[in-house]
Every structure is written in structure tokens, then in C-alpha cells.
A protein has these predicted regions:
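Glycine-rich beta-alpha loop elements in corrinoid/cobalamin-binding modules
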Residues: 56-173, 396-441, 450-455
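A short beta-strand-loop structural module common to alpha/beta enzyme folds
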Residues: 48-58
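Radical SAM enzyme core and accessory elements
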Residues: 1-8, 19-21, 28, 417-520
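Short secondary-structure boundary/capping segments
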Residues: 36-38, 126-128, 147, 227, ...
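Conserved SAM/AdoMet-binding glycine-rich loop
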Residues: 21-22, 82, 242-347, 351-381
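N-terminal [4Fe-4S]-dependent radical SAM core
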Residues: 1-20, 27-28, 169-209, 491-494
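Flexible glycine/acidic-rich beta-alpha junction loops that bind and position SAM and/or redox cofactors
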Residues: 267, 296-297, 320-324, 352-360, ...
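Canonical Radical SAM [4Fe-4S] cluster-binding loop centered on the CxxxCxxC motif
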Residues: 33, 201-238, 515
Length: 520
């Protein structure tokens, strides 16, 4: 039995709402997700609600061992499209009919949130009753109140349309966000496991998760998170240090993981890291923006316990121009040299298959990677990860098609020409499947359902690979995330001509969201 610290135990007989927060991936991934902690803490702050966690491959709660069918609401966090398969398995194994039209008033209300639900929930509409589009704290209180108000929520789904941010299939919805991050949920008593088993240890180890900002100002044309979670908001330094101090006191943890789409863009990142170090805390972060890394920041992170920095050059300069990635080769090399100087390891992320990429670009990429690897002062100090580019909804590249044959050829070329061991490329077939799930519509429902009971041949998924033009009606047309479609079309055309657009990082960054949040 797994021992956890800070798990919340209530008597479910004394609450009005039993809520299952489900993570359709492994425990270590679930406990690395700040959003999963936020839902747990936020809902359990209500006396009338008991939120329990259910983590794949289990279909019973960690707190009381209750099957999913025993809950009033079953909620799934959709972080990755490949997790859709696990959602359906968890429903089946939890005693809930997989297809929503087969459920009765005796079954729970099934909802979903997270990035995939906010960008394109359409492939899952055969299985999920309602979706939360946006940031949960902005809507969950009103949602729970509505559930408790209705005698049978599943028979009255239209009643939820009064709540901004709740999506019911075939209805328009506008994404909701927390206006001021000081009003967001910042869990202090975060749950963490007491174990040495690597299968259960979160990605950041025994760390307190500290959210410094939401959103991004960089304007990369391939990045869904950077497009839909706008505008950028950040927490004041004083509040962050107080949260870290209180959280680490309540958990006993000695390391802080900084969380945000663009952590190193935080306006007081050096002061934050210095403050945490002065508290005697180690600091780690998932990745850093090359443009924001300074000698002083690396020195602070080094003395705070960081061993590896992760940066994303993405490709060579000619391709970066199409992607609107404002970093030069010189800045990448300079950053790596700074890291080596401070005896830090470096992990580099690249993509293949970005729009405008040519055979000549691939040849240049091999030479560029070789040049960067040679900057290391010792073996394996610089590691490499290469992923196929996958178009995403609500981005300028949503009209691009995924070319499996081309990706396979490029992956083979890199494998033959990059001579280092610490190098991996994501499987192109898996990337194709992710593309279909990310960009498809409700035509995927039947294959998803079949996948619960049998292995669906990859060819059948490939046959449903979309091919959108600028005039196509997109499946997510009813999902308003605040991005002007005409702006996206203009950006796509500029990308094909390798023209760059300044990001929004010159705008004032505050904790508040403007009333009109349509971008550009």
C-alpha cells in the first residue's frame, strides 16, 4: 500500500457531493501535475464536497477505494491526447457505461478539463457529458453549486450552459481564466508519496510545486499553450516567497519546482531564486527560455541545487523564422557555454517537420546539433531530444498536415548522421496518432470506443488524418479561446514566407486580465 503525506480524509456520508478527480496516466505523472493538486485542494476546501483521486490504471479512489460508479461527478484531466484511451478504460473498469447515451440517472456525471478539453474536446464528446474550457478555479464553485441544485444533472445538461466556460457538444463556449493569480488556488498541503520506488516518485522528485505565472508572451506559431492561455499573468514576488515558505513548512519539503509556461520570463526570476535559496530551499524548473537566461540566474540556480537546464532551440535559424522563434544561433551557443561554465548539464529539445523545412535545413540541422554537442566539456553533458512537429488547434499551424512518410525519412536521416548515444526521436507512428486525436472531430468516436475492446490498426487512424485548408470548417469552431481566426490565418501565411511577428512581451505584464481578452 502506498503511503502518502497530506492526503485528505473525510467521511463521505457527511457530504453532499462526492467528486472523483481522475488522472488518466500513471501516478508519478499525476503527482507532477500542479493542476491535479489544485482541483484536489480547491474542492476539498468546500465542506459540502469530498474530492478523491483516481489514477490510471486503477479505477478506485486512493482515499477510500471507492469505484468510479459510486461518485456523483467523475472528472478527467486531459493533459495529453494519448490519454483518451485510458479515460475510456477507467470508465469501463469503474462500472460506468463508456458511451454517454448508454448511461442512466444512476450513473455519475462525467466531465473533463485540461489543455485538450480547452482546445479541442470534440473527439471525446461521445463519452464526456460536459467539458470545462479554461482554468478550473474560475468555474468549479459555480459548477458544483449547479450540480447540487439539480435533482438529476445528467438529464438537465442544458442548465449548465448558463455557466461561462462549460461546453456541451454543439454549443458555443468561451474560455474562462482566473483574472488575478492572487485569487487562484495555490495548494500548500500538497500530497506527495513516501517511497523510493521510481515508478511513484514525481518528475520533480520530492518538490513543492510553485506556480509563478500562467500564459506566455513569445508568440511561437507551433505552441498551443502559448496561444490559448493568454494574456500572461504572474504572481507578485512577495506572495510567491510566502507561499513557498508556508508550503514547505506544511510539507517538510526542501526543494521547490517553479511551474509556468515561461518560468524564466518571470519579471523577478533572479530575486525569486535568491529568496528561495536564502530560505535554504533547492530550486528546479522544467525548462528555461534561452532569451531570459543570464549568468547571474545560472549561478543562483546552480547554488540552489539545479543540475540540468533544459532549453529548446527547436531547429535551425531559417526554420525558426517560420516558427516565429526569436532566438539566434549565437544566443543558443552562448547559453550552452554559460551552463558549461557553471558545470551544469544541458538538455536540448528540437523538432522536425516544421513548416518550410527543407532537405538543406535537415543537413544544416545535423551540423548545428554536432556543433552544440561539441560545446560540452565532458561526455554526455549535453543530451538531445527530437520530436516530430504536431499541428495543434488554435495555432497558426493548425492548417498544416502531418506527413508521416516525411517524418520517418527525416528521423532516419538524423539517426544515421548524429553520432551520440544520448539521443532519441519520438516514434513517427505515435506522433501521427497524436495528430489525429489532436486535430480530429467526432468521427474519431467509434475508433476510440473500439480501442477499449480491441487493437485498432494504425491504418484506420491514418485514414482519418485530417487535411484542412484555410477555408475549412474546423471541428473546434465553437470553442472561443480568445484568438482571432483571421490573425491566425495571417500568421500562417507569414510563416510560409518566413516573416516574423513580434510577440506580446513588450506589453505590460500584470496579475490581471483585461476585460476584452481577444488577442491581437
Amino acid at each position: 500500500m502506498l503511503l502518502e503525506h497530506n492526503a485528505i480524509i473525510k467521511d463521505f456520508r457527511n457530504v453532499d457531493m462526492r467528486f472523483a478527480s481522475c488522472y488518466p496516466n500513471l501516478y508519478r505523472s499525476a503527482m507532477s501535475s500542479l493542476g491535479f493538486h489544485i482541483i484536489y485542494d480547491f474542492l476539498n476546501s468546500r465542506e459540502d464536497t469530498y474530492c478523491e483521486r483516481v489514477v490510471y490504471p486503477m479505477s478506485k479512489s486512493l482515499e477510500t477505494g471507492s469505484p468510479l460508479k459510486d461518485f456523483d461527478v467523475v472528472s478527467f484531466s486531459l493533459q495529453y491526447e494519448q490519454d483518451y484511451f485510458n479515460v475510456l478504460k477507467m470508465l469501463k473498469n469503474g462500472g460506468i457505461p463508456v458511451k454517454k447515451h448508454e448511461r442512466t440517472d444512476q450513473d455519475p456525471l462525467v466531465i473533463a478539463g485540461g489543455p485538450c478539453a480547452s482546445s479541442n474536446p470534440i473527439p471525446m464528446t461521445d463519452f464526456v457529458d460536459l467539458f470545462i474550457v479554461g482554468e478550473a478555479e474560475a468555474v468549479m464553485d459555480e459548477f458544483i453549486d449547479k450540480c447540487l441544485e439539480l435533482d438529476d444533472p445528467r438529464k438537465n445538461l442544458e442548465e449548465f450552459l448558463d455557466i461561462e466556460g462549460v461546453y456541451l457538444a454543439d454549443n458555443p463556449v468561451k474560455m474562462v481564466t482566473v483574472n488575478d493569480l492572487k485569487d487562484a488556488c495555490h495548494p500548500l498541503r500538497q500530497v506527495f508519496p513516501e517511497t523510493d520506488n521510481k515508478d511513484y516518485i514525481p518528475a520533480f522528485g520530492r518538490s513543492f510545486l510553485l506556480e509563478v505565472s500562467r500564459g506566455c508572451t513569445r508568440g511561437c506559431r507551433f505552441c498551443m499553450a502559448g496561444c490559448i492561455f493568454r494574456p500572461r499573468r504572474e504572481m507578485p514576488l512577495k506572495e510567491l516567497l510566502k507561499i513557498a515558505e508556508d508550503g514547505c513548512q506544511k510539507t517538510g519539503l526542501k526543494k521547490v519546482a517553479l511551474i509556468g509556461a515561461a518560468v524564466s520570463d518571470y519579471s523577478k526570476i533572479e530575486e525569486l531564486c535568491e529568496g528561495l535559496h536564502e530560505m535554504g530551499l533547492q530550486v528546479t524548473t522544467p525548462s528555461l527560455r534561452i532569451e531570459s537566461i543570464t549568468e547571474n540566474l545560472l549561478e543562483i540556480l546552480k547554488v540552489s541545487g539545479l543540475k540540468t537546464i533544459t532549453i529548446a532551440p527547436e531547429s535551425v535559424w531559417e526554420v525558426r523564422k517560420a516558427a516565429n522563434k526569436f532566438i539566434t544561433d549565437e544566443s543558443v551557443e552562448s547559453t550552452i557555454k554559460k551552463a558549461i561554465k557553471h558545470e551544469l548539464n544541458v538538455k536540448l529539445y528540437f523538432m522536425i517537420g516544421l513548416p518550410t523545412e527543407t532537405t538543406a535545413d535537415m543537413k544544416d540541422l545535423v551540423g548545428y546539433i554536432d556543433k552544440l554537442i561539441r560545446l560540452g566539456s565532458r561526455r554526455n553533458q549535453i543530451k538531445l531530444s527530437v520530436n516530430p512537429f504536431i499541428p495543434k488547434p488554435h495555432t497558426p499551424f493548425q492548417w498544416e498536415k502531418f506527413d508521416t512518410k516525411s517524418i520517418k525519412s527525416k528521423a532516419k536521416y538524423l539517426n544515421s548522421n548524429i553520432k551520440i548515444r544520448s539521443f532519441k526521436i519520438e516514434n513517427p507512428r505515435k506522433a501521427m496518432l497524436q495528430y489525429v486525436l489532436s486535430m480530429g472531430g467526432n468521427e474519431l468516436g467509434e475508433l476510440l470506443y473500439r480501442s477499449v475492446y480491441e487493437t485498432v490498426p494504425m491504418k484506420e487512424w491514418a485514414d482519418l488524418s485530417p487535411n484542412y485548408s484555410l477555408d475549412s470548417e474546423l471541428p473546434w469552431k465553437n470553442i472561443d479561446v480568445g484568438m482571432d481566426p483571421e490573425f491566425l490565418k495571417g500568421e500562417y501565411k507569414m510563416a510560409l514566407n518566413k516573416k516574423m511577428t513580434p510577440g506580446v512581451r513588450n506589453l505590460d505584464v500584470t496579475t490581471a486580465v483585461p476585460a476584452n481578452r481577444t488577442c491581437f
